[in-house]
């Protein structure tokens, strides 16, 4: 296609949201009108499905749940007055709590005010808050946030060591729907011990964000924690940024949460339009379907050309892959759906993997995120008439052109600046896109059976560890791996037993290996 035809195609397929100043350009996705027409019946169904979802239909049939994250930014849509009232009241409580913390009206026993936050959570309880903190927190926030988002002891130590002289002024958020998810539970226990080690009463520093009646809720109530905010069963982790999960840490950092909600609401309104060309989420879903033939055959590479949006690709990775990565469709057919997502930031990636994107395996489509405003205020010239921001813009446009010239598709999303409204809009845009795409390919976007399977498998390993250690505590002689497996009735788990024992031995847990470490079957194992 020559330059004139490309310009015409750009104008034909350009979407612009005047209120948000957001542009969506899908002109470099090479679908034709016949392809779009062929998908219109699927889109009619997707729009209808989404309308029913917003009315409170059971959109997550596997767990028999409503899906209501859209109600969070427009409570009037909620299916009952009780849900609407709870959403409104919770937001007011979050804002009031954040103000009291920031002003010192609520303060720790040994300091005039809180200065830091430890946020403990995993998955959607971490990725959304991390992305928003990186994108929107002021340079000098009223409270500086630190995340524990894993059960890695060294990672936990790193945070606690950094804050060892500030624990007495550090607020702790524990974010877990059930309170039983291992990663946040483990993090909470370790942090509790750190506070106890400094003779600090953990309850006077702790806030729970959890389901009403959960184990965590019961602990918070019985111990008298500072506050508890709700998580709803109709909001999944990966779509929870506009709930207490995201709003509490954001408000504490001084981020305008109402502006974020307003941006999301404006985007929700735009993505309700039942016309593909006039609905930005539908245009994205169309592009995803085209690129991967409706089967996820190509990866999505996300390149935000703005440092503050660095974590957007990680946020989208969970939102897209956990929602769309499914073995079965809604009819029970085996389909192996999903879209792999990865990325970092531009122009850094042009010195990393864009070489492969331009000339290597064409197994992807790119999503370029453009921010029109370079910085607040004027920029100095680097060259005559040229700023560093001009270079960044040039790199984005150059990458887009270079990819297209080599038959590699791309989408460009443009926002005027990074602020609470535009970040809220971006989150809402991709939440809706995932929902529409899921309807196009007939899958449940709102459950995660693979994650649950992984949790169960981990529990089996820990149970096996308990049996192995219990046996070795009773045995007076060293045993081989095969003997251990046989004695605990796990003859088919020799490899797992070996790896369990190797980990225990490396962490000074009393396990003694005798024999050739390079030949596991030769080892004799005992406890010291």
UniProtKB/Swiss-Prot annotation:
Catalyzes the reversible isomerization of glucose-6-phosphate to fructose-6-phosphate. Pathway: Carbohydrate biosynthesis; gluconeogenesis; Carbohydrate degradation; glycolysis; D-glyceraldehyde 3-phosphate and glycerone phosphate from D-glucose: step 2/4. InterPro entries: G6P_Isomerase (IPR001672), Phosphoglucose_isomerase_CS (IPR018189), SIS_dom_sf (IPR046348), SIS_PGI_1 (IPR035476), SIS_PGI_2 (IPR035482). It comes from Nostoc sp. (strain PCC 7120 / SAG 25.82 / UTEX 2576). The lineage of its organism: Bacteria, Bacillati, Cyanobacteriota, Cyanophyceae, Nostocales. It comes from the Bacteria. Gene3D superfamilies: Glucose-6-phosphate isomerase like protein, domain 1. Belongs to the GPI family. It catalyses: alpha-D-glucose 6-phosphate = beta-D-fructose 6-phosphate. PROSITE patterns: P_GLUCOSE_ISOMERASE_2, P_GLUCOSE_ISOMERASE_3. Its main location: cytoplasm. Keywords: Cytoplasm, Gluconeogenesis, Glycolysis, Isomerase. One of its GO terms (cellular component) is cytosol. The gene is pgi. It is found in: Cytoplasm. GO terms for molecular function: carbohydrate derivative binding; glucose-6-phosphate isomerase activity; monosaccharide binding. GO terms for biological process: gluconeogenesis; glucose 6-phosphate metabolic process; glycolytic process. Its EC number is 5.3.1.9. The active site is at residues 322, 351, 455. This is Glucose-6-phosphate isomerase. The keyword Cytoplasm applies.
């Amino acid at each position: 296609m020559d330059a004139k035809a490309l310009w015409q195609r750009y104008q034909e397929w350009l979407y612009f949201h005047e209120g948000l100043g957001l542009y969506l350009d899908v002109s470099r996705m090479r679908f034709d009108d016949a392809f779009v027409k062929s998908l219109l019946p699927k889109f009619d169904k997707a729009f209808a499905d989404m309308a029913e979802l917003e009315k409170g239909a059971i959109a997550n049939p596997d767990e028999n749940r409503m899906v209501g994250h859209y109600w969070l930014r427009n409570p009037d849509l909620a299916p009952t007055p009780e849900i609407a009232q709870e959403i409104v009241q919770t937001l007011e409580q979050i804002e009031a709590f954040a103000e009291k913390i920031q002003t010192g009206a609520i303060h720790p026993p040994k300091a005039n005010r809180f200065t830091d936050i430890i946020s403990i959570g995993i998955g959607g309880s971490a990725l959304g808050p991390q992305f928003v903190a990186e994108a929107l927190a002021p340079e000098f926030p009223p409270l500086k946030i630190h995340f524990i988002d894993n059960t890695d002891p060294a990672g936990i130590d790193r945070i606690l060591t950094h804050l060892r002289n500030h624990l007495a002024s550090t607020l702790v958020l524990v974010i877990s729907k059930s309170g039983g998810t291992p990663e946040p539970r483990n993090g909470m226990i370790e942090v509790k011990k750190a506070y106890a080690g400094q003779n600090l009463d953990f309850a006077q520093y702790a806030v729970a964000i959890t389901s009403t009646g959960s184990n965590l809720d019961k602990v918070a109530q019985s111990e008298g924690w500072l506050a508890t905010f709700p998580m709803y069963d109709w909001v999944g982790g990966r779509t929870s940024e506009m709930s207490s999960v995201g709003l509490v840490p954001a408000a504490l950092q001084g981020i305008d949460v109402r502006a974020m909600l307003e941006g999301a609401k404006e985007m929700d309104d735009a993505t309700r339009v039942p016309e593909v060309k006039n609905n930005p989420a539908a245009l994205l879903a169309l592009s995803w379907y085209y690129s991967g033939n409706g089967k996820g055959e190509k990866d999505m590479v996300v390149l935000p050309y703005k440092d503050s949006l660095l974590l957007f690709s990680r946020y989208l990775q969970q939102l897209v892959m956990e929602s769309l990565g499914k073995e079965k469709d809604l009819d029970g057919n085996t389909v192996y759906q999903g879209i792999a997502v990865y990325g970092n930031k531009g122009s850094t990636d042009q010195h990393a993997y864009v070489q492969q994107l331009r000339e290597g395996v064409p197994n992807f489509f790119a999503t370029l995120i453009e921010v029109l405003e370079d910085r607040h205020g004027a920029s100095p010239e680097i060259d005559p008439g040229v700023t560093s921001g001009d270079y960044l813009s040039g790199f984005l446009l150059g990458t887009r052109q270079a990819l297209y010239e080599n038959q590699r598709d791309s989408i460009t999303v443009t926002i005027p600046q990074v602020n609470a409204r535009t970040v809220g809009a971006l989150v809402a845009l991709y939440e809706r896109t995932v929902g529409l795409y899921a309807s196009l390919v007939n899958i449940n976007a709102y459950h995660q059976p693979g994650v649950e399977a992984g949790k169960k498998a981990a529990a089996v390993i820990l149970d096996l560890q308990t049996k192995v250690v219990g046996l070795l505590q009773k045995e007076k002689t060293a045993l081989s791996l095969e003997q251990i497996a046989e004695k605990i009735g796990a003859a088919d788990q020799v490899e797992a037993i070996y790896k369990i024992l190797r980990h225990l031995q490396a962490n000074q847990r009393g396990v003694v290996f005798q024999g050739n470490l390079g030949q596991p079957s030769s080892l004799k194992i005992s406890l010291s």
